[in-house]
Amino acid sequence: MGDVIVLYASPGMGHIVSMVELGKFIVHRYGPHKFSITILYTCGSIVDTASIPVYIRRISHSHPFISFRQFPRVTNNITRNISVPAITFDFIRQNDPHVRSALQEISKSATVRAFIIDLFCTSALPIGKEFNIPTYYFCTSGAAILAAFLYLPKIDEQTKTTESFKDLRDTVFEFPGWKSPLKATHMVQLVLDRNDPAYSDMIYFCSHLPKSNGIIVNTFEELEPPSVLQAIAGGLCVPDGPTPPVYYVGPLIEEEKELSKDADAAEKEDCLSWLDKQPSRSVLFLCFGSMGSFPAAQLKEIANGLEASGQRFLWVVKKPPVEEKSKQVHGVDDFDLKGVLPEGFLERTADRGMVVKSWAPQVVVLKKESVGGFVTHCGWNSVLEAVVAGVPMIAWPLYAEQHMNRNVLVTDMEIAIGVEQRDEEGGFVSGEEVERRVRELMESEGGRVLRERCKKLGEMASAALGETGSSTRNLVNFVSSIT
């Protein structure tokens, strides 16, 4: 079997896709004669969806040198009042015996050159060491988030309080290399509640990042603030010990030709052909990720703001969540689109706007000549897709580490405009604020400057993955460390 690199993905489609993209980049650069890729993944998580096996079959067929090994089904230990992340982290730990047996079996017929794990799979770190396999983390966020995560155990140590971050409304925290402080209430969602087991899990994960052989990051050096790269390289983020080597190898995003196979053909063609008829850089694209969702009241405010702005738009609307306070939905259930929007909105904006239900081919849409702006939930994959396409953003974070990303996109990278969210109302944004930010991005001089900056970054993103680019060089350095 030769040399193999084993990747271990956290549960959930997004984590598996990120690992696949890393595997594809390695094989694309070195060829299957140098390395094959094996991706380990779990079975039975509460975040699993029906699309995962379909995706894996497709990748197995189109990329034969990437193989998948699914673990036996494990039952979630679901307890009342325990959060989904805490249940998921416990589920991952229950899979440790399967990790051990997989590495043992693979090692019998091949040389495992590296074991690359997701941050949430930290319990597998000592298992890699058991087999004397160099073990690396794959960070699917940017360098600024990595800097924050490396420093988080220090903040935990220094925060002499029993209060949770979600309750520290007047407190801000500084991270090495960041230009502006972060509100305590905008910390990564996993650590907002000190009483949630996910809090101590996350601190544990972050404290183990420096104990790996290195960290691979899905970003490229030219995108990141120099102060952040210097803070990581200079050891400021891990003040009590050495920082392992860090390899920036992005932007790794899913290819258009693969995405298109999963699309609903008719609706996809409708929105793409509509975009082809619009003037250059005139359309605002609104899409909030695979799970981002709003209650009906917020959808109506967005609609009012779009209508008042007078701008062209393509808006992906998902079914409102069952719980009013939730900002996530799983799956793409059907719903009455007209029923969640203001009466007559679709008719009044039909000459300049298009609303699609649940899904649009985001990578393809962002690359259309007519798209001039992107309202995003600030998920890192979406950010990279916009950067590659050279499209400026309006940052509207919803959950996970997205508020942290917003800070960096607006203040440090200067590639987005932030919306003003009412924290006391669950992040509610008024229609007037939507109109204001849409006009600022699409009509103002500041928006034009942002667009020019993003266009240049798009060119840099392409260059980073080129033969002499920074990300290719960093991948070569990583491979040198394992061979």
UniProtKB/Swiss-Prot annotation:
The keyword Thylakoid does not apply. InterPro entries: UDP-glycosyltransf_plant, UDP_glucos_trans, UDP_glycos_trans_CS. Optimum pH is 7.7. An anthocyanidin binds at H15, A400. It catalyses: phloretin + UDP-alpha-D-glucose = phlorizin + UDP + H(+). Highly expressed in roots and at lower levels in leaves, flowers and fruits. Pfam families: UDPGT. It is an enzyme of class 2 (transferase). It comes from the Eukaryota. The keyword Transcription does not apply. UDP-alpha-D-glucose binds at T140, A360, Q362, H377, W380, N381, S382, E385, E401, Q402. Its EC number is 2.4.1.357. PANTHER family: GLYCOSYLTRANSFERASE (PTHR48048:SF20). This is Phloretin 2'-O-glucosyltransferase.
